[in-house]
Structures are given as structure tokens and as C-alpha cells.
Swiss-Prot record:
Domain tr-type G: 5-187
EC class: hydrolase
CC terms in the record's Gene Ontology section: plasma membrane
Name the record gives this protein: Elongation factor 4
Keyword terms, alphabetized: Cell inner membrane, Cell membrane, GTP-binding, Hydrolase, Membrane, Nucleotide-binding, Protein biosynthesis
Described purpose of this protein according to its UniProt entry: Required for accurate and efficient protein synthesis under certain stress conditions. May act as a fidelity factor of the translation reaction, by catalyzing a one-codon backward translocation of tRNAs on improperly translocated ribosomes. Back-translocation proceeds from a post-translocation (POST) complex to a pre-translocation (PRE) complex, thus giving elongation factor G a second chance to translocate the tRNAs correctly. Binds to ribosomes in a GTP-dependent manner.
Gene Ontology biological process terms from the UniProt entry: positive regulation of translation
Family note: Belongs to the TRAFAC class translation factor GTPase superfamily. Classic translation factor GTPase family. LepA subfamily.
Amino acid sequence: MSDLSHIRNFSIIAHIDHGKSTLADRFIQICGGLSEREMEAQVLDSMDLERERGITIKAHSVTLHYKAQDGKTYQLNFIDTPGHVDFTYEVSRSLAACEGALLVVDAGQGVEAQSVANCYTAIEQGLEVMPVLNKMDLPQAEPERVKDEIEHIIGIDAGDAVLCSAKSGMGVPDVLEHLVRVIPPPQGEIEAPLQALIIDSWFDNYLGVVSLVRVKHGRVKKGDKILVKSTGKVHQVDSVGVFTPKHTEMPDLKAGEVGFIIAGIKDIHGAPVGDTLTLSSTPNVDMLPGFQRIKPQVYAGLFPVSSDDFEDFREALQKLTLNDAALQYEPESSDALGFGFRIGFLGMLHMEIIQERLEREYDLDLITTAPTVVYEVLLKNGDTICVDNPSKLPDLASIAEMREPIVRANILVPQEHLGNVINLCIEKRGVQRDMQFLSSQVQISYDLPMNEVVLDFFDRLKSVSRGYASLDYSFDRFQVANLVKLDVLINGDKVDALALIVHRDKAHQKGRALTEKMKELIPRQMFDVAIQAAIGGQVVARTTVKALRKNVLAKCYGGDVTRKRKLLEKQKAGKKRMKQVGSVEIPQEAFLAVLKVDS
């Protein structure tokens, strides 16, 4: 075996706001990756969106050189991971390239559901997990309680957890020292044929596809001809290097290292994430086990406001898909909105982020329809189909049963907020599976319908628990449910983009709330606009946007009642004629009203 004992590959697992990006900044400062002038808070969160929202969305990598107390200089390859539940697959990708992970826990708040889930992923992949308690400078830090929680909830020994404060820099060198001792070096053979895993890739307008890779065996240098295993295409390497976090070219990348490869690949699908690279001279190297393809949980239609932008929109989506392996899309057309795409997302945050990235980075104006989850429908002829768009639902007469996706949700919540959280879960049709009392927190697990979870469950959970509850969920199974399709009719015409699939018990209430909401949003016309919610042929709710009308009696001072009646009848006839030919413009807010209706 080649000597790779000076290399350490690790990533940081932490819940949102537990300080992993700040800790990364401290590592970069201590190892001198950037000069004082270039240093800014959250160096690795390079997207404007990440900085504004204060969350990490994409995985980033940095190579640092750390001179340890034993006199050796270690090469630390650090891969930053996101902490939000919607980006779990980014985490599993980052972990596939590491031998160890730092579990960063806020010493004041304690363990949160998200870190638990990511920590299990790390342990399953055989990584060495090293606990670190952050935010020790806060007065409310309780290291002993949090160590107990780590041992109880996650089940790893936290006796020698390192205490630090990334903000003030206290204890950060201890973290690095500990890391070099605890995390094992990579295994690999430099002289063997090249075998490298693509962790991430993104599209650069000048360079083509830039791939972030972890080299398992062998080496790759500029001028090599590389073969992408899944496509079978050969490309010539233009440059290889690492991020320190600056883009730094290197003569070569060797086994055990993490860095980037640019090979002038112009085809967006040329280097899929999770693929294996090798040299064209050794084409029969085995594929590395990648990571499972992630299935989108939420689907929504996105349509360009002006139909001329359709091609630009398609191109923008292709570039984003390269960078975001979880995006899936297919063309869709709607009577109300024209041509667009039906896009699959991992959750609501993911959807918002993608929409914002499309609008900002590619300068598009988009309309989004209400998101839905995937339902399984068993037809009377025995076929089973998956429906991700309410307007594609077959006729009710041909459906034998409908099944909705159920998620298993794990919620960690302080005891004083337990009652509120349980009420929320019951309101969302949840079934309790398990409850465990840990020192000051309670861990409850519920089976919840996914369509109740994806829309606003996360926000509601935070508000009923004053921000202390944390949530992690994963798809469990499909279960038969009494579901119906709720259509919205405006002046008797169905608007396909507003259809919803809802539980029959909630259909009337949802229909009423939705029509009331639409009434506020649709501007008044010169004629009455009827807004109806219907299940099949049965109208369950109706409101009317009253017409704007001129006061035709203003010129009559006194006089005979028949004169007034004649003028009113004439106006009425005019309005009736108008209603037959008039069409109603539906504003963008109305399409999103569907989300805002609290069931």
C-alpha cells in the first residue's frame, strides 16, 4: 500500500445554525488558506442565496495543510455539507468521499433530529464520527447534558468530545489535533490504475463541466485521457487542482486526495455525479459504489411568464440539473399557463431555492403552481400508475383505490412544548408510533401523510414549539386513503393549474377556504366572476367577485320609478353580454393561494 498517512478526509455534520460554516472559517484561518484581507464570514457559502439565508445548500470542498504538534504536516481535505432536511442527499454524497466526520452540536441547544439522521448515514457508511461541542462561549452552554444526549440519542461515546467555540476561536486547535489522531487515513494505491468518484459537478460557461472528485486509486494529471464509465466517452484533462478555498491548480491528484478535474466537457450530462472516472488506457476498472439516486418528493409546475423565455428556461434547467443531482423535470403544458416544466424537488425549501436561483442566475420570470406529492393510483383494470399532477388524475369512475405516501417523522422537542407538537401532528392526520423521554427532550416518531408534511409542517412545527423542535423525515410507504380531486372553476371553466388532491374529510373546508382566498386575489372585473370549488360534478363551495358598476341613476333626480328600472335593466343586459365574452386574468398570487390555505 502507498503511504497516505498524512491525508485526512472529513466532513462536518451539524444541524442548521449549529455553526459548521463558522468552524470551517476557523480551520481555514488557522491553516492559512486565505490572507486576512480575503477572509470573510462563511467563506464556503459562495452562493448569494446561501449567504442571505444563512444556510449551506451545496457541498463545498477545501484542501488545507495543517502542521500538527507532532511536527508532521497533514493534508486535510474538508468537505462542507448542508444541514437542512431537504438536502440530505448532498450529505450522503459528501460522506462517500470521507473516512471520518465531525459531529458538531450546539452546546446550548443539544442534539437535533437532523444531525441524528446524518450521523446514522455516516455510521452506516463506516465513517469514524468525532463529536465536537460548539458555542461553548454562550452562557447557556451545558456540555455535560449535551454529552449525555449524544450518548443516548445517537449512541456514540462522547466522553472525550472536544469543547470549542468557533466564533471566538477557543478550542479550535484542539479540534484539529484530535481530528488528526482520531480520523483514519485513506486506503489506496497510487501506482494502481486510476479510479475516481465524482462527488459534485457544476457548469462553468468558460471551462465547461468542472467535477469535484475523490481519487480512490492511481493518479490523474493534466493531459491524461480520462474515460467516464457510465457514458463511455473519453475526454482530455485540461487541468486538475484543489480549492484552498481559492481555485489552485496542481501538477496531479493522487490516491486519497479530493480536488477538481476540468476536461473541457461541454455536454451537460457528460459527467454525472456519482460516476467513476478512469484512464482510457485501463477501461475495465470497476465502477465505484456511488450513492443511491434520490427520488423527488414534491412536484410543482414552473412556467415562464412570457412564452418566449421557454428555451432559455430549458437551458437554465439543464445547467442546474448538472449541479443538483436531485432535480428531475419533464415538459408540461397547461391551458391556463402555456408551456413549462413539471419539476421534482426534495421539499419546499429546495423548491424555493431552485426558483430563486433560476430567477436570479438566469434572469427568468416564473410562475409556480401549487406543489403536490406523488400518489399511487390502482385502476379498476388492475394497473397501478403514479400521479404527480392533479390534472393528470384519471376519471374517478375508473379508479379502484388511491394511495398516498406516508412518511415516518422523527421529532425532537423540549418537554414543555410536547403538547402543542402532538396537537399539530393530530391535526395533520398523524399516527403516533413511539415516544421516548430523554433528559430534557422528548423524541417522538409519527407516521404522517407526506402531503401534510411538505407544505407548511416545518414552519408550523417551529412556531408551535417556539423554534425548539427539530424534524427529520423519510418516505416509508404508500397507504390507501380516501382522496378526492378538488377542481377550481372560474366562471364555469376549470383552471387546470389550480386543481388539488385532498382528503375527502377536508375537501369542503379546503374548498371554502380556497374560494374565499381567491376572491381576495382576483381583481374585480366589469362583470361578476363566480369562483367555485368542485369535486367531480358536485360544487362544494362558491364565492363571487362582485362586478364594478357605474351608478347609472346618478342623472335621475326624483322622477318615475319605471325610468330608473329601465336604466338598471339596460345595465344588467350589458353586463350579461360582457360576461359571455369577457375573460378573467388570474394573477400569480392566486396560483400560490393554494399553499397559503391553512387546512
